Amino acid sequence: MSKEYFGTDGIRGRVGEGPITPEFMLKLGWAAGRVFRQEGRRNRVLIGKDTRISGYIFESALESGLAAAGVDVAMLGPMPTPAIAYLTRTFRACAGIVISASHNPFNDNGVKFFSAEGTKLPDSTEEQIEHFIRQPMEIVPSSQLGKAARFEDAKGRYIEFCKSTVPFHMSFAGMRVVLDCAQGATYQVAPSVFKELGAKVETIGVTPDGLNINHEIGSTHPDQLAAKVVEAGADLGIAFDGDGDRVVMVDHKGEIVDGDEILYIIARDKMRKGRLKGGVVGTLMTNFGAELAFGELGIPFERANVGDRYVMEALLRNDWCLGGEGSGHIVCLDRTTTGDGIISSLQVLAALSDLGITLHEAKKGMSKLPQHMINVRVSQKVDIKGHTTIQSAVANAEKQFAGKGRVLLRSSGTEPVIRVMAEGEDEAKVRSIVAELAKIVEGSV
């Protein structure tokens, strides 16, 4: 059954436009409550959010809907998305809800759900929720209405959990770190974690006003952090996105260290310690340089479709524990159940501390290959794999790389374009091949 509202990462859109309205959120809360309240038991659902001004409206609406279905609600306030996943498990809640649009601007918002195990809901549960969204709303008898409360110690619990992912004997004393919290959900938690582990911390992006989340700051805009790291003479910088499930880093020279490089550093350290279970999962967009670097280490590598949901599916299918995306979604299943920017960055700092090296030195084992991409607009959906002219051109381009590069054509899931991308050792050659392929695609669709 196809879903009307749920996408690959929950429900998301522009505030005030369906389905991101108070009316829909009320119904969504009720529908979810009907699904979560099984066998008449009074289950509890956690609600967290990022710092968007609209989060307060939707928090109230979801709370009302859940209570109307007879479900108790615990509201945690602004908290990173992965914190909700963790706390859902430790509080023994039946589900967790996050109100966030991740790295998007303040005028977008959305909702994502976590199961009792702290993982994303299966399709079958999302389909059940959509079924009840289409039904008339019926409130349980007054004696069965859910109760709502705010939990004040949630931040402290999550801070202690983050710290527990670093060896007990390890301290980051003497390490100078700049944190960019993107005016988002990590603005209180992240500084506390790194300070309590001994690091000297400077911060930017820790004064959210409900409107400035992700605005020219955070993991999608690391330039401000890079400048601050160099200016402060810091050892490194760490940038999160608005809801804290992504991380990008900056070395002491101001050079960006993206998700592919972070994934490589963590994988190499786990392998060195004998703790890497199986191989590593990347995506179709993971830089070819990462694939080559993993190969040199003898680490199996597999590509999944773009999106942390697909990375997770590949990890579970292979029974592996580490995967991620260039955008900074890093999943360490031996530490947590979802992408976690704070915990991923802690694994990097622990590796640096253990080896006594800088972030700049740690990333040297992987050389990113030049990458170029052109978006070709199309008027209708195109079967790329079944198009003989396009596939012939792709095969010819791959021959030119002779195993030292790759070509990728894929349709966007959000806009009417075909993304034509190539990577290789020679940047001029890469650009030439992409330009030629883009022309062929334009002339064939």
Swiss-Prot record:
On modification after translation, the UniProt record reads: Activated by phosphorylation.
Q: Provide the binding site for Mg(2+).
A: 102, 241, 243, 245
Swiss-Prot/TrEMBL GO biological process terms: carbohydrate metabolic process; peptidoglycan biosynthetic process; UDP-N-acetylglucosamine biosynthetic process
Top-level taxon of the source organism: Bacteria
Q: Which of the residues bear the PTM Phosphoserine?
A: 102
Which InterPro entries does the UniProt entry name for this protein?
A-D-PHexomutase_a/b/a-I (IPR005844), A-D-PHexomutase_a/b/a-I/II/III (IPR016055), A-D-PHexomutase_a/b/a-II (IPR005845), A-D-PHexomutase_a/b/a-III (IPR005846), A-D-PHexomutase_C (IPR005843), A-D-PHexomutase_C_sf (IPR036900), A-D-PHexomutase_CS (IPR016066), Alpha-D-phosphohexomutase_SF (IPR005841)
- Whether Transport counts among this entry's keywords is no
- E.C. designation(s): 5.4.2.10
GO CC list? cytosol
A matching Pfam family: PGM_PMM_III
Q: Which UniProt keywords apply?
A: Isomerase, Magnesium, Metal-binding, Phosphoprotein
Q: What is the protein's known function?
A: Catalyzes the conversion of glucosamine-6-phosphate to glucosamine-1-phosphate.
What is the recorded name of this protein?
Answer: Phosphoglucosamine mutase
